[in-house]
Amino acid sequence: MVFPAKRFCLVPSMEGVRWAFSCGTWLPSRAEWLLAVRSIQPEEKERIGQFVFARDAKAAMAGRLMIRKLVAEKLNIPWNHIRLQRTAKGKPVLAKDSSNPYPNFNFNISHQGDYAVLAAEPELQVGIDIMKTSFPGRGSIPEFFHIMKRKFTNKEWETIRSFKDEWTQLDMFYRNWALKESFIKAIGVGLGFELQRLEFDLSPLNLDIGQVYKETRLFLDGEEEKEWAFEESKIDEHHFVAVALRKPDGSRHQDVPSQDDSKPTQRQFTILNFNDLMSSAVPMTPEDPSFWDCFCFTEEIPIRNGTKS
């Protein structure tokens, strides 16, 4: 008797992904910009075309290209078959009818300062935020802290103000902010969440550039949230990145690090260039020269917030 051959579906192996793209140093040529816009969905082209500042348009474009690169290369879905949607809160997600071997596949992007960043996990809930340390546009640092007083708990402010140097205090402020935003983005609640419900116990206080640390602990309404873990890193001297991780059902996952793990991990951010972003791209729409003309009329945001050199 001859039995029919079994058909096996090869599921691509996927680990966590951490990517960053330097929007601040990217000066797209006409050919690059027109190729990029041909490689995203029409509704996203329209959205990006509405930005007043080139800085915002570049960051949004980089974010869309990173997402499509992720889905194409990690899920093996052809670039021109990828359908991205947005939730009611505006979060980009893969369309539910997509051929996805990972039912809990999760990704998140953030852009601020000079970078757009992406974190993705095959099984874990994930949120990411990046913050650039910069001086307040108006007023002194103490005045800025007074305005933001209700965003942090008393203990968090004690940690921030424990440093004598105001620049270091500002550094710690943005590190705390990135952590809170990463959690809020992971749970998808958007604006309206009371930030003082969250309290982060930072550890270590000093982070080395290029390393990833997983010691910081989260307390929600005074109770430690052990099912959550946070990866912290500095891409460069001025940019903090926080990645919030949790298994979707709330239980601990073997890939969610314990707060007792005091050693930096090797899940560092890979810095991509434009050629990396486009390595799997397939143009989906005709070339539109007017989109370049409109981009040329946008301006970079005036730099009112200085950074310490």
UniProtKB/Swiss-Prot annotation:
Keyword Metal-binding: yes
Matches recorded under InterPro entries: 4-PPantetheinyl_Trfase_dom, 4-PPantetheinyl_Trfase_dom_sf, AASDHPPT_N, P-Pant_transferase_sf
Keywords carried by this UniProt record: Cytoplasm, Magnesium, Metal-binding, Phosphoprotein, Transferase
Coiled-coil boundaries: none
Gene: AASDHPPT
GO biological process, one term: pantothenate metabolic process
Cofactor note: Binds 1 Mg(2+) ion.
Cellular component, GO annotation: cytosol; extracellular exosome
Organism: Homo sapiens
Catalytic reaction list: apo-[ACP] + CoA = holo-[ACP] + adenosine 3',5'-bisphosphate + H(+); apo-[ACP] + acetyl-CoA = acetyl-[ACP] + adenosine 3',5'-bisphosphate + H(+)
Protein's name in the database: L-aminoadipate-semialdehyde dehydrogenase-phosphopantetheinyl transferase
Major place of residence: cytoplasm
Species lineage: Eukaryota, Metazoa, Chordata, Craniata, Vertebrata
Biological role: Catalyzes the post-translational modification of target proteins by phosphopantetheine. Can transfer the 4'-phosphopantetheine moiety from coenzyme A, regardless of whether the CoA is presented in the free thiol form or as an acetyl thioester, to a serine residue of a broad range of acceptors including the acyl carrier domain of FASN.
Result of altering D129A: Reduces affinity for magnesium by 10-fold, and holo-[acyl-carrier-protein] synthase activity by 30000-fold
Tissue: Detected in heart, skeletal muscle, placenta, testis, brain, pancreas, liver and kidney.
pH dependence: Optimum pH is 6-10.
